[in-house]
Amino acid sequence: PTDFQAVKKAVIAHNIEMVIVGPEAPLVNGVHDFFLANDELKNIPVIGPKKDGALLEGSKDFSKEFMFKHGIPTAKYQSFTKDNLQEGKLFLETLTPPYVLKADGLAAGKGVLILDSLDEAKAELEEMVSNQKFGDASSTVVIEEFLKGIELSVFVLTDGISYKILPSAKDYKRIGEGDQGLNT
């Protein structure tokens, strides 16, 4: 839920002693910061990053910039908006298929397109940035080179001093057999 006042009421009414935030949207919108800034909630532990940390999940463009800045290996990329759409189409021409287009913002797991056709990739880029195929999430689109391999999520708990690595998880995103079809 992103209605933080309603969350506050529920936490107080039910005497909740710890909050574990699962969905990305409340984190990106600053639920952890809301707890820290509120006298009635600031002593309740919240598991989940503050708004600044959640931006790593909430913006693909920010994440890519962060990875490049800190020397973290990642695919070659560029970001585009409707203002530089033609440059985006030209960038697609420099890549080898398949083409990867990612809505910059949160799109409920649906904002990534992997396309084999250059013409289709150009059309989808235009649909994303000009017609907001994924709403505001696709006002900026990250185009990156395709990397073949297994995608894993690694989870780490930290208090800012120490950390604990949790088990990794593989998300089987595609609807069809053989990792084909749309994301689920």
Could you say what each language-model-derived stretch is?
Residues 80, 112-117, 156-159, 166-167:
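Short beta-strand-to-turn element immediately C-terminal to the catalytic PLP-Schiff-base lysine
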Residues 11, 15-17:
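Proline-aspartate-enriched helix->loop->beta-strand connector
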Residues 17-59, 71-82:
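A short, GP-enriched loop/loop-strand-helix hinge that lies immediately N-terminal to
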